[in-house]
Amino acid sequence: MAKRAEPLPDPACAASDIGQQIVRWLTHLRAERRLSPKTLEAYARDVRQCLMFLGQHWSEQVTLEGFVALEPADIRSFMAARRADDIGGRSLMRSLAGLRSFARFLEREGLGKVGALGAIRAPKVGKSVPKPIHMSAAKRFADASERAGEDREPWIWARDAAVMALLYGSGLRISEALGLKRRDVPPPGAGDVLVVTGKGNKTRMVPVLQNVLALIHEYVAMCPHSLPPEGPIFVGARGGPLRARIIQLVMARMRGALGLPDSATPHALRHSFATHLLSRGGDLRAIQELLGHASLSTTQIYTGIDSERLLDVYRTAHPRA
């Protein structure tokens, strides 16, 4: 299927020469940098919003030449306008990152250097502390019997329990768990490591507890749909790929029954995995590897070690071990 073309900026505020370079830049990010579709969409939106602001600010179309000649005051005015629209610090940081990425692309292509962006400091952003779910409650999310009163087929209970067990038991992102193929999960007695594809299509080895594997195999045995080796292991009621929204809704219903706050989400199970490992003596760098964080600073909000060390830390520290 052909890839969707990125929308050009509004021609009322931006000339065709800069619009064409934006399309080339986004194509480069997709093909060479392998950024996620959501990141590409956000970057494209941020740059378009900047061009719309500049077009109104200058009362003329923004050309490539005009963009290269930006003054620091122009960027500060754009950021101030975004703040006035109640845009938060993290979104402003992303906007600035997108503009800088586009500027670097123009410079590499020999189209000029946007010096104004180098004079702008990134907005300060307070670090948000993840809210882990209590250990006993986190385990209950992976217990299919907690949903015994629901009018659902037992295989769906088993499926949801297996997914949530992976989020808490192996610290996977919801996209990583739902992206697993049947062949990615070892059959009974054939190992306890998953090869997970994370952000940027990077793969990592992730240990998986035997009781989590047992839940996955129980679901597979109960599933009425065909699960070919190259297809997704987790499927929806009609046999298609399972959507993250389904698991989010399941957790929303369960957290109400368990008396948990709205912060008890699929991603909170991943946070809980890291927090509970760390509280039991897990090594910070080992947890970084398990989570697939590119930078230790990301892990330090709560979380090159060899695979045997990862397995040892995991088996020793995880509360489900």
From Swiss-Prot:
GO molecular function: DNA binding; tyrosine-based site-specific recombinase activity
Subcellular location: Cytoplasm
InterPro entries in the record: CB (IPR044068), DNA_brk_join_enz (IPR011010), Integrase-like_cat_sf (IPR013762), Integrase_catalytic (IPR002104), Integrase_recombinase_N (IPR010998), Integrase_SAM-like_N (IPR004107), Tyrosine_recombinase_XerC/XerD (IPR023009), Tyrosine_recombinase_XerCD (IPR050090)
Main subcellular location of this protein, as a coarse class: cytoplasm
Cellular component terms per the entry's GO annotation: cytoplasm
Domain Core-binding (CB) stretches: 16-107
Keyword vocabulary terms for this entry: Cell cycle, Cell division, Chromosome partition, Cytoplasm, DNA integration, DNA recombination, DNA-binding
Annotated catalytic residues: R173, K199, H267, R270, H293, Y302 (o-(3'-phospho-dna)-tyrosine intermediate)
GO terms for biological process, alphabetical: cell division; chromosome segregation; DNA transposition
Record domain Tyr recombinase: where: 128-315
Family: Belongs to the 'phage' integrase family. XerC subfamily.
Its job: Site-specific tyrosine recombinase, which acts by catalyzing the cutting and rejoining of the recombining DNA molecules. The XerC-XerD complex is essential to convert dimers of the bacterial chromosome into monomers to permit their segregation at cell division. It also contributes to the segregational stability of plasmids.
Subunit structure: Forms a cyclic heterotetrameric complex composed of two molecules of XerC and two molecules of XerD.
Name this protein carries in UniProt: Tyrosine recombinase XerC
Organism: Nitrobacter winogradskyi (strain ATCC 25391 / DSM 10237 / CIP 104748 / NCIMB 11846 / Nb-255)
Gene name in the database record: xerC
